[in-house]
């Protein structure tokens, strides 16, 4: 990956925001599932 020709690409901050949100969402669902008891099967 090179920093040249970044036009037309998704901004890095947008990628970080989306990835961070998805990661937090998955962690929240996993911890909630394990707290309720559904995640114990995982």
Curated annotation (Swiss-Prot):
Signal peptide: none annotated. It is a single-pass membrane protein. Its main location: plastid. It is found in: Plastid, Chloroplast thylakoid membrane. GO terms for biological process: photosynthesis. It holds the Pfam family PsbJ. SUPFAM superfamilies: Photosystem II reaction center protein J, PsbJ. The chain crosses the membrane at residues 10-30. Coiled coil: none annotated. GO terms for cellular component: chloroplast thylakoid membrane; photosystem II; photosystem II reaction center. InterPro entries: PSII_PsbJ (IPR002682), PSII_PsbJ_sf (IPR037267). Keywords: Chloroplast, Membrane, Photosynthesis, Photosystem II, Plastid, Reaction center, Thylakoid, Transmembrane, Transmembrane helix. One of the components of the core complex of photosystem II (PSII). PSII is a light-driven water:plastoquinone oxidoreductase that uses light energy to abstract electrons from H(2)O, generating O(2) and a proton gradient subsequently used for ATP formation. It consists of a core antenna complex that captures photons, and an electron transfer chain that converts photonic excitation into a charge separation. PSII is composed of 1 copy each of membrane proteins PsbA, PsbB, PsbC, PsbD, PsbE, PsbF, PsbH, PsbI, PsbJ, PsbK, PsbL, PsbM, PsbT, PsbX, PsbY, PsbZ, Psb30/Ycf12, at least 3 peripheral proteins of the oxygen-evolving complex and a large number of cofactors. It forms dimeric complexes. Belongs to the PsbJ family. PANTHER family: PHOTOSYSTEM II REACTION CENTER PROTEIN J. This is Photosystem II reaction center protein J.
